[in-house]
Curated annotation (Swiss-Prot):
Name of this chain's protein: ClpXP adapter protein SpxH
InterPro entries given in the database record: Adapter_SpxH, Thioredoxin-like_sf
Organism: Bacillus licheniformis (strain ATCC 14580 / DSM 13 / JCM 2505 / CCUG 7422 / NBRC 12200 / NCIMB 9375 / NCTC 10341 / NRRL NRS-1264 / Gibson 46)
SUPFAM superfamilies: Thioredoxin-like
One Pfam family per UniProt: Thioredoxin_5
Amino acid sequence: MTLNQRDQFFSHCHGHPQKPMEIYMFVDPLSPECWALEPAIKKLKIRYGRFFTLRIIAACSITALNVQKRKKRRLAEAWEKIACRSGMSCDGTLLHDKALSAPYLASLALKAAELQGRKAGLQFLRCMQESLFLNQQDITEEQVLLAIAEHTQLDLEEFKRDLHSQSAVKALQCDLKIAAEMEVASVPTLTFFNSLREGEGLKVTGNYSYEIYEEVLFEMLGDEPKPSQTPPLELFIEYFQFVADKEIAVVYDWTLEQVEREMKKLAFARKVERVEAKHGMFWRYINEHHDAGPLYQCEK
């Protein structure tokens, strides 16, 4: 992918102070419902990212409380049900074997990663989710978090310091305060704000189809703008590096059967490789240059 191609299809997806809208996305890295939101968020950013900046707000206390109260077996079963319903694989095997040691640490690590930039935080969050839900790694353990930081090409020494710093603690406390003030009781929750309009934002709690989020965005914009061009499939895979068949289906308005046909063509051309998950399928882009570090794809 050339820089011009990247700019043409993806530059508008990043944060910019002149965008009229901001979306607060309240998440917990341990929440399978937040993981299930990935396809809709990808599509919204690709089609209308020129209008909004996405701000990640950690709401760890909500999921942490549920993790501590519910029996491991029941929690694992809930993960499996969410995977079957959403199409985003969640393997609850880890929860049968052990309890997550320090649920808050995953959100603290997210804030530590964000100290190296908003984009770094988003990449770190995605990699945490892949590690937990696909690879059954305990992202509440520091060694796992350090491996994720290295994989997402953060400054590792800086991340180690920040993970134990007051800066990360204060950032997390600020997020929890925002969640309390906005009466966020569960994750995921998206709150849409328009800087050009007075009044409170619109809050959407729960996991819905892409069309619901698009409708709320239009309502807050007061307009139904034309969507940005969706990138060709190969460029999409190259940019994100590791994606679920469900994500492709949502972004391109395809059935899973159509996704399978199109991805087989790329696999035959040795552009991608298939990665089977417990529920569904993922696809990894094959980098021509091995030193071209991947954006995502956290492996075991």
